[in-house]
Amino acid sequence: MTKRPYEQLPLVFRHDPASGREDLLVSDRLSAAIAIIDHWPDWPSPVVIIAGPVGSGKSHLASIWRQMTGAEVIHPTAGSNAADIASAGPVLFEDVDRQGFDDTALFHVINSVRQNGTGLLMTSRLWPMSWPVTLPDLRSRLKAATVVEIGEPDDELLTQVLFKLFADRQLLVDERLVAYIVNRMERSLATAQLVVERLDHLALSRGTRLTRALAAEVLDELANARCAD
């Protein structure tokens, strides 16, 4: 078995990802969602749902919209004051399918938004018709919402995202290295985040540059982890 280079524990420095409107990477798969955000408050309906896979850019778009509107984050659970908050201004409910919600509470939020002319943005990995809704009135309200889907990233977007993620960590990388990664990685922005995070960690711990060999090791690790799941 090949012995791996000695790894030291790297110092952890904070590296906040750039998440403003000017940092948003534009591609065909994001164009509809970006248009919705940019056209606030002239939305086709007061409730908008952005649906897409993990790491597809939903959180970035939601963050931009929240900065634009001053929206409050809500979680419509039983007994919450989410509907009252929605009556006063725009509200954001992220990761709907993962966080879960109370049917009646979300129904009242949507009614409050419609009655008071505010706005509700929700993000989800699943389309709303796949949510576990049992309240017929809520299902009817969700059918009236505007749903925008974000698809899987293409090579061009993955390349842009990798360069951005490396730049967020103040790392300079060769175009050929990025092309190597793009050609071999899973088509997912979440995977791009994992690749950059792991590459940065290994390079720091071993005191080495970002190389093709290091990238190959990281990609193999991630592939093996997927096979083990």
Where are these regions (language model features)?
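Conserved nucleotide-sensing/catalytic segment adjacent to the nucleotide-binding pocket
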Residues: D84-S124
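Conserved AAA+ ATPase "SRH/arginine-finger" region at the nucleotide-binding site
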Residues: A145-L157
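C-terminal helical "lid" of AAA+/P-loop NTPase domains
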Residues: A179-N183, A190-L204
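A short, basic N-terminal segment
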Residues: M1-H39, P44, L204-D229
